[in-house]
């Protein structure tokens, strides 16, 4: 894997919105009826970080339905720099699964220097919230993960999440945080995202 390639894996219960999060970031699309395949798939997105003088390729891996059977191959996790734990804020069980299964699964199958993100998705359904943000933040702190409240449907903090993944890849100890604020003052940007469309690539035939 290239020194400029950041492998990101998303895990969590089926229905939490992992595929929709990826689709929103990579192609700026939302389709809740999007079909999954029987094997993991990945998409690639390129981000340029002028501040760091780096261009990073994000390889974003989706379990694509295998999480239903909890039979994900170790190859899925191999070489991951970032692990994103996704739960549905309207589904308490999906959050409990993160704590009881997915975090341990990630921890056991990734390197010690892998960075973790905890993502509460479906912020657009806030009135149906079952998982309180304070509870999620407390858990994120306990596992040394950064916390994000997102909505793939309304495109809330999706770009922020993945841009931050690139920053953590460049400098795991960085305290820099992207907050959906791409400063263009004096012609400078914190990041520039390649606008090309990407189609998911399956890893099995």
Q: Can you say where each PLM-predicted feature lies in the sequence?
A:
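Conserved P-loop small GTPase signature centered on TRAFAC-class small GTPases
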Residues: 1-15, 19, 23-26, 38, ...
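Post-Walker A helix-loop "phosphate-sensing" segment adjacent to the P-loop in P-loop NTPases
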Residues: 27-35
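Conserved alpha-helical scaffold flanking the Walker A/P-loop in AAA+ ATPase domains
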Residues: 43, 70-75
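Conserved catalytic network of the ASCE P-loop NTPase/AAA+ motor domain
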Residues: 50-53, 74-79, 107-112
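Switch II (G3) loop of P-loop NTPases
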Residues: 55-69
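Generic enzyme active-site microenvironment
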Residues: 57-60, 86, 119
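Short acidic active-site motifs
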Residues: 68-72, 94, 135, 157
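Conserved Switch II/interswitch segment of TRAFAC-class P-loop GTPases
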Residues: 80-100, 110-113, 123-130, 153
């Amino acid at each position: 894997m290239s020194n400029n390639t950041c492998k990101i894996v998303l895990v969590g219960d089926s229905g939490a919105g992992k595929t929709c999060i990826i689709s929103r970031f990579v192609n700026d699309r939302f389709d809740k009826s999007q079909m999954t395949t029987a094997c993991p798939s990945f998409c690639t997105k390129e981000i340029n970080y002028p501040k760091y003088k780096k261009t990073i390729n994000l390889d974003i891996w989706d379990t694509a339905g295998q999480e239903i059977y909890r039979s994900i191959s170790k190859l899925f996790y191999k070489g991951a720099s970032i692990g994103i734990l996704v739960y549905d804020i309207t589904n308490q069980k999906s959050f409990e699964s993160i704590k009881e299964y997915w975090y341990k699964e990630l921890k056991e199958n990734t390197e010690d220097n892998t960075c973790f993100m905890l993502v509460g998705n479906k912020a657009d359904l806030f009135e149906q919230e079952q998982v309180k943000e304070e509870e999620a933040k407390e858990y994120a702190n306990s596992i040394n993960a950064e916390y994000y409240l997102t909505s793939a449907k309304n495109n809330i903090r999706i770009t922020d999440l993945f841009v931050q993944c690139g920053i953590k890849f460049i400098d795991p100890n960085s305290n820099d945080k992207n907050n959906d604020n791409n400063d263009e003052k004096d012609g400078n940007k914190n990041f520039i995202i390649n606008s090309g469309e990407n189609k998911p690539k399956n890893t099995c035939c």
